[in-house]
From Swiss-Prot:
Assembly, per entry: Interacts with dehydration-responsive DREB2 proteins and a number of transcription factors belonging to several protein families.
PANTHER family: INACTIVE POLY [ADP-RIBOSE] POLYMERASE SRO4-RELATED
Protein name as it appears in the record: Probable inactive poly [ADP-ribose] polymerase SRO5
Originating species: Arabidopsis thaliana
Induction entry: By salt stress and light.
Gene transcribed to yield this protein: SRO5
UniProt keyword annotation of Nucleus present: yes
Gene3D superfamilies: 3.90.228.10
């Protein structure tokens, strides 16, 4: 959903300053960016899409203000090759489930993998290949960070462009039964058929290790997040987060104070923003001009606590 923080200053000021939406960033407004996504078989997700908003908030929480999230794209599995990869993943998921007796052994998680722009086409067309973008300290394979730790993945990468563009793949990872892999390992496959993947720690996992023998059957790239980040990333302290509320909920609350004619205008502006005819900044300014900040502050403070996450 299209979330609005319950502090009106944060809603209106932060979104204009930090480029917090796809449209404002300019990342996917040009024909070249659209052709880039089309070439990879990806579909841009807009604000209001559930997957977009979950990924955006997860990234924003994990990366902080030092990174600018430019766009979120989903693998559409449009061509024969990508659909075959999806089917392959599903077949191996069933096989792992059968191997472990159907007792939940086919564990699937989401994990982050940092890639360069020139690697993207190869990965989406042919799959992962070596050499991989890791230090090899846990053996030969693909290392992914848990979905709540995008910064760990991003810190392992280096921006190859002057503008600081980074690319993160959010992948479905078929972990199955994991074993601990000690640092310094030189293995490229599980220690025995009992195991399907590796981790650095079973309790506090920072790395998923998918062996080179498994990385094109047990990893399925599903989302691509384009990020602009400084060369030297730091683990910034987590900031206090204000509660959020859905924009449609805000419109519903405004309908108790504004005449129907003004609500219709706000709904039209919101629809225009969803269809990318206007940017989020323009939507915000137009809503403010209709309601005034005083009414917005009152409604958001009164209603925001009901939709905290």
């Amino acid at each position: 959903m299209d979330y609005v923080r319950t502090q009106v200053e944060a809603v209106f000021d932060d979104s204009e300053q930090d480029g917090s939406t796809i449209s404002e960033s300019g990342s996917c407004d040009s024909s070249s960016d659209r052709s880039f996504a089309d070439e990879l078989g990806l579909m841009e997700l807009l604000e209001g899409d559930k997957a977009h908003d979950l990924i955006y908030r997860n990234c924003k929480s994990g990366l902080g203000d030092q990174c600018q999230i430019l766009s979120v794209l989903r693998n559409g599995f449009r061509n024969v090759g990508s659909r075959a990869k999806l089917k392959t993943f599903q077949v191996f998921q069933e096989a792992v489930q059968m191997k472990h007796g159907g007792d939940g052994g086919a564990k699937v998680k989401y994990g982050w993998c940092s890639v360069s722009k020139h690697e993207l086409k190869t990965i989406f067309e042919y799959g992962f290949s070596e050499p991989l973008r890791n230090d090899g300290s846990f053996g030969r394979g693909l290392y992914l960070s848990p979905d709540n730790s995008p910064l760990d993945c991003l810190k392992d990468s280096a921006s190859e462009s002057e503008d600081g563009m980074r690319f993160l793949l959010l992948c479905r990872v078929l972990l199955g039964k994991s074993e601990i892999v000690p640092q310094g390992s030189t293995r490229s496959c599980p220690s025995s058929p009992e195991f399907d993947s590796g981790v650095d720690d079973l309790v506090s996992t920072k790395k998923y290790i998918v062996w080179s023998t498994h990385m094109n059957t047990h990893v399925l790239p599903e989302f691509l997040v384009c990020i602009k980040a400084p060369f030297n990333l730091t683990r910034s302290p987590k900031r206090l987060r204000s509660p959020w509320m859905a924009f449609p909920v805000l419109i519903k609350a405004l309908s108790k104070f504004l005449p129907p004619s003004q609500i219709l205008v706000i709904q039209k502006h919101y629809k225009d923003q969803q269809n990318r005819r206007i940017t989020r900044s323009e939507l915000i300014q137009r809503v403010r001009s209709i309601t005034g900040d005083k009414l917005l502050v009152h409604i958001i403070k009164a209603c925001g606590h009901k939709v905290q996450h």
